[in-house]
Amino acid sequence: MVAADSAREAAAQLRRALRETPTVELRLDWLKSDSERRRFLVFLQRNRPRRALLIATCRRRKGGGLLAGSVQDELRWLAQAAAAGCLWCDLEVESLRKLPRGSIRKYSLPRRILLSVHDFGRMPRLDAAVGARWRGQVDAIKIAGAARTIADSVRLLRFAAKSRNCVAVPMGEVGLPARLLALREGSALAYAPVSAATAPGQVSLREMKYLYRAHALNGQTQVFGVIGDPIAHSLSPLLHNTAFIARRINAVYLPFLVKNLRDFLKAAPDFGLRGFSVTLPHKQSILRHLQDCDALSAEIGAVNTVVVRRDGSLYGCNTDYVGVLHALGKKLRLAESRVLVLGAGGSARAAAFALTRAGAAVGISARRSAAARELARSAGAEVVPHGALQTESFDAIVNATPVGMYPDTAISPLEPGELHCRVVMDLIYRPERTQLLKLAAQKRIATVSGVEMFLAQGIAQWELWMKRRAPQKSMRRAVLAALRAEERDRSSP
């Protein structure tokens, strides 16, 4: 999808898009003025790309677009797009309703018409959207509805699978997994912006093609994912999809924004999930939905990895445990060390159990005092009141809270005066250098980034699902490159 405010940028986006796909939507309404629209269409007419399928769209504001004009203005621009070489146009249903029935073919529009039904507040009534009224007037229908629940996404994918010439676009972050699977499920097209995503639930064209490989997914593709809330910050899709690509495995790993576990688990079979990672805030609550889990997960009381067995039953494991030991063990002899764990959630539980089993004396400090006491009792640790941190000393401090996580990167769970230790480890990996780690470094305290734990637990997950060795170097390289690029973007003026 080409969406730019100037003819120059639209032309540049079109060139980039055509290097990746022959089918491109041109959002003429995004161009900031009529003169920019004219300039771009002149460019298009003079530089008609060969073997390209161009779809012209000039959506009015009333239909969710940017064109400040009437239906006749919209049709005029679409007719000019046809003259410039566009074979298809996207026409909003509200515009078609304003025209006399059967009159649309009288206009000099592109040869093929894609009728768009948009609802930015909810999923529209699907059967009503594709009614008999439009038959013979249009060539295909696009349904773009806000997916408020995962069940909404499933409903739209099922509809696309049984309908001819239908384009399914589940909108919003909840709809992203279904959007990535749309082509596999029968949608005629899948949409992605040429540049970075412009709204929740979008991924860029390069991500869709090279990370998720949406065009190559088929009925044999194994589907995995990560569930959490929030989930947009997660680099797990990059980590796992990089491994699938490196090992040439027909599998994909998708991000699921999950607010209600029960709703997700009810819809999960429709995605054909073979396994999924579990992150905040579901690591503990997922336990009651599992049919079985390993002894370690039951003892910890938290799960970060689920295997979906052939009979559909769910089996839980915890690889956070491995990640903590792997990462902190590089800096510190854990046996007989005194380690403070901040937090009492799922990640904190894994850290506390891992460290006590490794022979460390563990202290728990958490905002929720009852949860801190329960974790200390079950893990064989002690409770350390927050007020004691000004005077208490430790060999290591481990932050297992989300404080400092992207996008709230300027805050730290501890003040400099509370850092009395030799090593500080932060389980947050995005950003790589959290505010807590920066404060520790200023005091010449050794630091351990959450990236090390993230990689270790993710590699263990991948090997658990795939039953083969993971391409660790490729996975590490991809994650570090993404984090360093992010850091450069943040520091550039």
Please describe what each predicted stretch is.
Residues 170, 223-231, 318, 328, ...:
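Glycine-rich adenosine-cofactor-binding loop
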Residues 358-379:
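NAD(P)-binding Rossmann-fold cofactor-contacting core
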Residues 427-493:
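Adenosine-phosphate binding glycine-rich loop
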Residues 1-10, 60-72, 116-124:
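Active-site mouth loops of central-metabolism enzymes
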Residues 31-46, 93-107, 124-126, 148-160:
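Active-site-adjacent beta->alpha loops and helix N-cap segments on the catalytic face
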Residues 3, 23-31, 57, 78, ...:
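Catalytic beta/alpha-barrel core
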Residues 377-448:
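Rossmann-like adenosine-cofactor binding region
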Residues 221-332, 431, 443:
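Phosphate/diphosphate ligand-binding glycine-rich loop within oxidoreductases
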